Amino acid sequence: MTVVNAMPTYKDIAYASASPTQKLDLYLPEGDGPFPVVVDVHGGFMMGDKSNPAGTDELLANGYAVASVDYRLSGEAKAPAQIQDIKAAVRFLRANAGEYKLDPERFAAFGQSAGGNLVALLGTSCGVEALEGAVLGNADQSSCVQAVVDWFGPTDFLQMDQQFAGTSCPANHDDASSPESQLVGAPIQTVPDKVQFVNPITYVSAKAPPFLIQHGTADCNVPPQQSQLLYDALVSAIGADNVTLTLLEGASHGGAQFSDAANMQLVLDFLASNLK
């Protein structure tokens, strides 16, 4: 995991009031703005927090504001509360863009693992009312984003154990105690409709923004085929020029191959080309 050296410019901003969890930290680069925004979503579903957003030092050095968002974990609320929180955070930031020197027209989302699922869902479900959570505030604002960086996020939970078949990786996502089952409130294979409700592929359309998807070939937490499924669906909808899938040979569920300078440059180049 990359250690963030920067300190938040604003810490624990409440973006909604339904839960004390609904807070974000905002990191601003030097200058007067308005700054393009990268909304960082942590992994975990069941655990984790906003304290260590990925690539923040590099993003700040390149002129991006970073909003690191906490969301209700599955022990507090079941899906779709998590994506509704992320959308509420985006709407809050747009509504208060002037105060925080943000550019409301240039928003990207960046997430790892469970956060990858949530940013992919954020990207594909623009305008989907059932996932919006408008009651959380700023309903007049858009929650759409202009680019998505998805690091090893799961997509179709129902296929994960099948995709691990024949490998040395544990196939335990169908278990009642798995993060995915805890997210939807039941063993995933017993509630396929709930699972598809939070599958970003469900909402892929020609309206989807450009995506950079990265996954390690040796990931034993989320099968790399999960990213391939999303990539294939996006290519069909928005064209191969707007979607990049990078499979990092030998990389596991995160690690140095994602956060090293060469790979972070790929992320920065992608953001620069899509947040002009």
Where would I find each of the regions flagged by the language model?
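Conserved alpha/beta-hydrolase "acid-adjacent" motif
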Residues: 220-229
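Short beta-strand/loop motif that positions the catalytic acidic residue
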Residues: 212-215, 219
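Mobile cap/lid helix-loop segments that gate and shape the active-site cleft of serine hydrolases
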Residues: 2, 159-203
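N-terminal cap/lid segment of alpha/beta-hydrolase-fold proteins
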Residues: 1-32
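Primarily recognizes the serine-hydrolase "nucleophile elbow" in alpha/beta-hydrolase
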Residues: 91-165
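Alpha/beta-hydrolase active-site loop
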Residues: 77-98
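Short substrate-entry loop that stabilizes the transition state in hydrolases
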Residues: 33-35, 41-78, 129-131, 158, ...
